[in-house]
Amino acid sequence: VELMEKEGVVFKLDTEIGKNYPAVKLVNEFDAVVLCTGSTKPRMLTCEGADLKGVHYAVDFLKANTKSLLDSNLEDRMFISAEGKNVIVVGGGDTGTDCVGTSIRHGCKSVTQLEIMPELSEERMPNNPWPEWPRIKKTDYGQEEAIELYGKDPREYLTTVTKIEGDDMGNVKAVHTVEVDWSTGA
């Protein structure tokens, strides 16, 4: 970042364009504009049982892990531990991959990653030519670690959660899923 600043890149952090910095001013003052965003609010699960003990959102899981790692190399134990747990990650994107990898490094018993979309081809399809962004299957570090450790890809495609079942203490006991059928345009 320092090198980029020395080269003339200006960073405007924690800025709400249109509110505390006019969009027209931004466009007029700079040769190029790059908007970098990140979500601090999770996409909430809407199924029964989403409020049970043991259901954690990625932003909370990853943020606490990173803070504990940077502050104490995880020695303060101020993170949500996946150690010894059977982990279900809902979501197949980069954040889901981070959750898979972090859970493995915690020493989870198993990890399954649910992906609502179909498995993509390893090669470009005719309707996805260059220079479009390639819509191909991407096996990232989290999945690679799972394959190495457990002998199989953790991803379950065309799958979504319908219910999270709890025990008498309010802890997650089971996750109910259903296969998604996109052929009807659902």
Language-model segments: which ranges?
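Short glycine/serine/threonine-rich phosphate/pyrophosphate-binding segments
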Residues: 94-100
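Beta1/beta-strand and adjacent pyrophosphate-binding region of the FAD-binding site
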Residues: 80-93
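A residue-level detector for conformationally permissive "hinge/kink" positions
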Residues: 30, 52, 76, 83-85
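Short glycine- and Lys/Arg-enriched binding-loop motifs that mark or flank ligand-binding interfaces
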Residues: 34, 45, 87-89, 99
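Flavin (primarily FAD) binding-site architecture
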Residues: 36-51, 55-59
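Mobile, glycine-enriched helix-loop/loop "lid" segments at the mouths of ligand-binding/catalytic clefts
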Residues: 52-66, 181-183
